């Protein structure tokens, strides 16, 4: 027992709340963006590859975004700039109403 279990329970609760919020808001967004550190939903995304020496980093600009982060009280963000050297995954969310033949 003890503190670590309580903290774990608290974090599990936060994750659950976050998941419910995610389920509620995903319909508002067009894209899912994953970096090595974060997961975002957004309506506009711009990815620029920038060479530095022999390396490349990615500069992402997201606007009208939502951030998967259990420690933020407000997860809606007007714009986010992310710089990463790791892979970036951008997926367009399919809107169910567009799938009807």
PLM region spans:
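Conserved RNA-binding domains used in RNP assembly and mRNA/RNA metabolism
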Residues: 2-101
């Amino acid at each position: 027992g003890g503190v670590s279990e309580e903290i774990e329970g608290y974090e599990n609760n936060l994750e659950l709340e976050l998941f419910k919020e995610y389920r509620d808001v995903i319909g508002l967004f067009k894209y899912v963006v994953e970096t090595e550190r974060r997961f975002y939903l957004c309506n506009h995304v711009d990815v620029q590859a920038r060479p530095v020496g022999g390396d490349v980093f990615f500069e992402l600009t997201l606007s009208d975004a939502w951030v998967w982060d259990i420690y933020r009280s407000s997860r809606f963000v007007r714009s986010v700039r992310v710089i990463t050297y790791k892979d970036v995954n951008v997926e367009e969310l399919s809107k169910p109403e567009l799938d009807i033949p």
